[in-house]
Amino acid sequence: IEELDIRGMHVEMGHKEVGGIKPKIDDVGHVFDVCEQLELDWLFSSNPLQAADNELEARIIIREVFRRNGLDVSFKAKPILGVAGSGEHTHVGLAARLKSGKIINLLAPEDMKSDYLSTIGYGFIMGVLHNYEAINPFISSTTDAFNRLKPGFEAPVCIVTSLGHKPELPSRNRSILVGLIRDLENPKATRFELRSPNPFTNIYLAVSCLYLAALDGIKYAVNSGRGPKELLGELSKRAGEDAGYLEKDREYRCEKNVFEDYTQEERDAVFGKPPA
């Protein structure tokens, strides 16, 4: 953490995660086969290119610190079968800087307690979901990456989002692909969290694809003439219902637990079959 802070990463948290395996003790009391899963989060960058540079630099620094202490580190998505893999949840947002210097979050609605997102915000998430099958090869491109995306380990398997049951109750659904992060008292914090990347995802390509897909959805939302309520209705549609932009035969929003409340057959029918 100190090494990352020195380089301007501004680490916000570092803690043990649910992965890892129990260590062993030999006959003389020595501990061996120690394997823990750790999480590090650092402050976002307003420049997507700088954010990708930071991710690459952090990986190099972490590996070097471990090496100096006689330890090994793995950034594989699924280094050990049967336990939780390693993800790299990627947060993306959209803001505008006015001539006055004021920054406005373009995803946030005018009233945080009466709506989830702005028109641009709905277009953003709809674009990512509608185009995710084209994005996915740039996110999960290896067998190791797909091995992580399995039910039972809080890793996403369906192209679906969660907004929350009510605008005043932010979502805490950890079973979806893209989450909406909101702070009712801080509209500038409104952003999306993509939960499928792993530490070896090429973040340069991933972020580029995300914003291109988002732009496609934003163009639809803005040019459709629909307001936030109508766009929310399309995002929340049921499978089989017609839509102006999203596919007819699938759903894109779920406030239930995708793993616990659906069988695999139901998930495939409602949200589409996953690529893995």
Where are these regions (language model features)?
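Glycine-rich, acidic/polar active-site loops that bind/position phosphate-bearing ligands
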Residues: 1-276
